[in-house]
Amino acid sequence: MIKIGSSVVKEQKKIFNQCVFHPTDAVEDAWGKRIIDKMAEDGAIDTVRVYAMLEDIAYRDEDGNLAYDFRTSDTRLDYLTSLGFNLVIAYAGIPDCITSKVGGRTSVAKNKTRYKGKMWNGNPPDDYAEWEEICYQYTKHISERYGERVNGWKFHCFNEPDVVNFFMGELDDRKEVAKRCAEYLNLYEHFVRGVRRANKTVMVGGPALACVIDFLECFLNGVKERGLEMNYIAVHTYGTDPELLNSGEETLSVKAMMKRVMDRVRVIEKCGFSHLPIVMDEWGASSHGFFNSEECKILMFRETEINSAYFIRFIKELTDASLPLENLMICLSGQHEMVEDFTGFRNFFTLNFIKKPIYNAYVLASKLHTGVVECENNVEYLTVLPTKSDKGGYAVALAYAKEDFSPEIAEITETVEFSENIVDKKITVWCIDGECANPYRLWQRMGEPRIEGELIKVLREEGKMKPKCSFCATENAVDLKLTANAVYLITVE
């Protein structure tokens, strides 16, 4: 029995429907627009993180002076803002024109290059004044172009400077933390100066940490010592990685994810920054969104109901922890790598634009309210996140899963009972499980045939998030059939 109370015990900001759209330079492409359009239409995402892609903007003119071409950048941001998205912008990467260092270019992708044959430049600028000027010119341009709405966005300096893939690849990211951090602090200081010359109010932050906790501590202490402005702290958190999954050292686990979250929080508190909001501008049940089943067979969970159950359990744990979290952004970094439909990349849609269960979980999460109500739950393995609107409506998310999301779990029927009288109100029940809103499982049951023609239509239809049932309540309870890794949403209106 699950009993849903009527009293709001805490308020939770609507921060869960956010993503990193990757690669940023797919925003101007038809396939990228198709995904973005659908996210906006379904209300699955309201805030998007993109790279500024300063390497597409800054160049040298014939006299060797810095010059700027904002047209491609404008195309991207115009499109995103036209659909009403709020933006988080990472000022990255380093334009080739301000660093003379040879090497230091990486793909951070399955392929030898990034999207459209590009490479990531992780070398520091030769002259930080030029980096500052580029940050100033970019901020000035978008502040003038988009006006007051920019003040609701967030800007941060670079991406994952603590690891070799993104910054100063010649330095060991575990043994040479201090040297790497000192260089990044220079980058951050001039980023803040450049932004503030153009805009006095937009929120600025860093470091968009990947995983090196010592780097985070070094950075925060450096910010304090240098007296630098910082309005929020950006960190990335992944529950595990493919290498640990392959070795059996770790399994999928929200507890492991929350341990990594709290490791970051403890450093933030230790360094005296507990007053600042936290922006988790990348998350995933596993890192390496550009890896798939070729590198790690367990990554096939990304195609299944497991990923949606993980998401619901994770946001419940974050809600319970009452952290100063302002953004939670799933990173969709496998989108451009696909050559088949179901291979385990970290994205919302397959190659043929078939919705995955994780996408549908985001659609359901968008229906949650800001008021979290009391709840009694004595069902083993069941996570319940009950919310209430200021108009008295309810939206209750549930996930039934073991800690490691194993399929070996008893199938049960449980009753969700509301303490408030809901008779005559409209009840709608949505479900994601092995048989509902799950194209991959349907394809498996069909014998994994070649995906083409009519089958694409069938799988797209299966991927649509439709109510399992909708009815006028005649009692204050709803019965649910719980199967392994099932997700439910119950709304009362």
Could you tell me what each predicted segment is?
Residues 76-86, 141-151, 190-202, 226, ...:
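A structural motif corresponding to the C-terminal end of an alpha-helix
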Residues 1-44, 484:
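Mature N-terminal, pre-catalytic/accessory segment of carbohydrate-active enzymes
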Residues 237-271, 291-305, 311-314, 348:
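Substrate-binding surface in catalytic domains of secreted glycosidases
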Residues 43-252, 288:
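Substrate-binding cleft and catalytic face of glycoside hydrolase catalytic domains
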Residues 450-493:
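C-terminal beta-strand-rich structural cap/linker in extracellular carbohydrate-active enzymes
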Residues 280-409:
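Aromatic/acidic polysaccharide-binding cleft in carbohydrate-active enzymes
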